[in-house]
Amino acid sequence: MIVTSKGRYALRIMIDLAQHREDGFISLKTVSERTELSMKYLEMIVGNLKKAELVQSTRGKEGGYKLVKDPKDYTIGEILRCMEDNLAPVACIKEGEIQCDHSGGCLTVPMWKELDDITNAYLDTVSLEDLLTGEKWRNKT
């Protein structure tokens, strides 16, 4: 699994909105300045986040974006899945993907499917709040 820049930047945007959630709607210009991401890229990413109903927007002078839920109620899995076509570790197990010539007898497919399940399950245990506080990883060596 390789998380693309879209997925990584979506997390940065969601973290920024979470850190400043008391400010109400936040303009993309402000998010751009704080995250050092281009406006053009931000527009594309927040469009996906809005379509997935992870953020809401309003127009006008006080317009911008904000989270629709509390940070503890977002999983990293749901954020990444709205940005990434697929988080599968190999192409042959991607949903709708054309199988390779060896898929019928491939002995590695069960392992890849299990890795995919483990990865997705883990990402669904990590919340946006976990990233904000870092508590989940404190005292781990």
Language-model region placement:
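The C-terminal cap of the DNA-recognition helix in HTH/winged-HTH DNA-binding domains
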Residues: 19-22, 33, 51
